[in-house]
């Protein structure tokens, strides 16, 4: 579910689903999967759009409520969106470091 709020840029999403797997196993799977992804970060704390604005980062938080898993994400759709993805893909295609030109926080916003 994408959320619309009082913000000019960024995307906040939320996923809820029934879940009957082990909590620690699930957290471990997510941690292992994103370990080598330079722009995706798992957070134990509440996530906020301000943390990702003007960056190519995506923050993910996983919570469990009885038999429900709740995954929330935040990203800046103007950088992590199409433009940042294009730069990241070109870096991979041409053999450059995946994060080349993307590890900065813009000074304007």
What label would you give each PLM region?
Residues 1-75:
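C-terminal substrate-binding/catalytic lobe of Rossmann-fold NAD(P)-dependent oxidoreductases
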């Amino acid at each position: 579910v994408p959320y619309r709020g009082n913000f000019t840029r960024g995307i906040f999403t939320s996923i809820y689903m029934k879940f009957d797997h082990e909590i620690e196993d699930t957290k471990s799977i997510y941690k292992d999967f994103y370990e080598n992804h330079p722009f995706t970060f798992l957070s134990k704390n509440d996530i906020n759009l301000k943390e990702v604005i003007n960056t190519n980062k995506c923050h993910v938080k996983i919570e469990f409520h009885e038999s429900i898993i709740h995954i929330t994400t935040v990203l800046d759709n103007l950088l992590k969106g199409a433009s940042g993805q294009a730069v990241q893909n070109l870096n991979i295609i041409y053999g450059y470091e995946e994060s080349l030109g993307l590890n900065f926080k813009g000074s304007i916003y």
